[in-house]
């Protein structure tokens, strides 16, 4: 299983520069049934990342839309069916080809959408359900990726939708000079991120619908070690007083109970992808992407996550450090053979 995921990630990263974190965490989210938001300036390949994710699933249907304050629910969830209104006086949407029938969804500029769209997305993301007239339909949705170059405005009731995006990633421009030059010289026909439905079907590493359903049940059976729960408790406690700025007071970073539950699903999925029957402490390393509320909190939270993971071994590390210091302080210097003896003592 691990080797297959490595090959799949290799295929998905081909022709895309420095987006390994975005793609690997998005695949993790897709297998866990969670959603991702990419934050970053325009032109940093956020949409390209989302398009590559449909390549992970054989025969996947995708839907993408650029939001604006003028976007209507019809554009996202499908127009009202005139035929249904005429023949049976039923208010239903013609959903084929729109979000309710897609496996992978990409919504750009998510915070520009109006309340009617955003409120419907709450149920879509969390329960994978969509109410179409008097019927409630189960969605085939495996992953919803949203993108924005700004955080949700405060005081406008967007906190619930923001909380639904379990993984939050800051997407940045290309930093390595070598990759930047390769990108400049790349012609359009060679560019990555243009996976077609046919390519998704042809990819032998792509995940089938049957495998996805089977793996979802297998992920539920993954165990959790006690030391993982101890580490999570330590992280949760540390979030009550995060030192973001030395000059400012420590802040309480709030993480909802629902969010912690979704994070545990990610951890189980991580263990499954690595052929393990139990979640290990190492699976916790990327969860700082799930915990921050403001971008400036990210590095501080990453540091406290690492500290919590290594805290149980701190005493042993100190003991090893002290022993090493003693070995350096006192060591044996062998003199030349004709002097006939060794010297052992403290080296100043």
Predicted features along the sequence, with ranges:
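Conserved C-terminal "switch" segment of AAA+ ATPases
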Residues: 1-2, 15-16, 169-248, 276-277
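Pre-Walker A (pre-P-loop) alpha-helix and adjacent loop at the N terminus of AAA/AAA+ ATPase modules
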Residues: 2-41
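Conserved RecA-like P-loop NTPase ATPase core
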Residues: 18, 26, 38, 76, ...
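Short loop/turn elements that form and flank the Walker-type P-loop nucleotide-binding site
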Residues: 24, 31-33, 58-59, 99-101, ...
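Conserved alpha-helical scaffold flanking the Walker A/P-loop in AAA+ ATPase domains
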Residues: 25-28, 82-105
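Walker A/P-loop
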Residues: 27-69
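Canonical AAA+ ATPase core
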Residues: 83-88, 104-117, 123-206, 215-218, ...
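C-terminal engagement/docking regions of AAA+ P-loop ATPases
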Residues: 245-255, 261, 269-348
């Amino acid at each position: 299983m691990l080797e297959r995921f490595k090959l799949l990630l290799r295929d998905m990263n081909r022709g895309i520069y420095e987006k390994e974190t975005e793609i690997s965490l998005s695949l993790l989210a897709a297998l866990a049934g969670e959603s991702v938001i990419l934050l970053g300036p325009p032109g940093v390949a956020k949409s390209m990342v989302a398009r590559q994710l449909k390549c992970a699933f054989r025969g996947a249907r995708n839907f993408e839309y650029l939001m604006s304050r003028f976007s209507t629910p019809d554009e996202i969830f499908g127009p009202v069916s005139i035929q249904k209104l005429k023949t049976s006086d039923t208010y239903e949407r013609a959903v084929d080809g729109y979000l309710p029938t897609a496996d992978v969804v990409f919504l750009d500029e998510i915070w520009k959408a109006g309340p009617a769209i955003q409120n419907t997305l709450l149920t879509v993301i969390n329960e994978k359900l969509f109410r179409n007239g008097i019927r409630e339909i189960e969605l085939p949705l495996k992953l919803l990726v949203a993108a924005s170059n700004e955080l949700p405005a405060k005081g406008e009731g967007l906190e619930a939708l923001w909380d639904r995006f379990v993984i939050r990633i800051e997407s940045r421009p290309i930093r390595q000079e070598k990759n930047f030059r390769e990108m400049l010289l790349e012609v359009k026909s060679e560019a990555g991120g243009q996976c077609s439905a046919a390519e998704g079907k042809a990819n032998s590493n792509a995940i089938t619908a049957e495998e996805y359903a089977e793996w979802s049940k297998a992920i539920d059976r993954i165990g959790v070690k006690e030391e993982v729960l101890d580490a999570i408790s330590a992280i949760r406690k540390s979030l009550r007083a995060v030192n973001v700025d030395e000059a400012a007071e420590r802040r309480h970073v709030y993480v909802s109970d629902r969010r912690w539950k979704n994070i545990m699903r990610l951890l189980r999925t991580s263990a499954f992808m690595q052929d393990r029957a139990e979640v290990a402490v190492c699976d916790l390393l990327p969860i700082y992407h799930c915990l921050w509320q403001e971008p400036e909190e990210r590095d501080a939270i990453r540091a406290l996550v690492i500290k919590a993971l290594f805290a149980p071994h701190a005493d042993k590390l100190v003991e090893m450090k002290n022993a090493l210091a003693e070995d350096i302080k006192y060591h044996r210097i062998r003199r030349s053979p004709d002097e006939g003896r060794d010297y052992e003592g403290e080296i100043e």
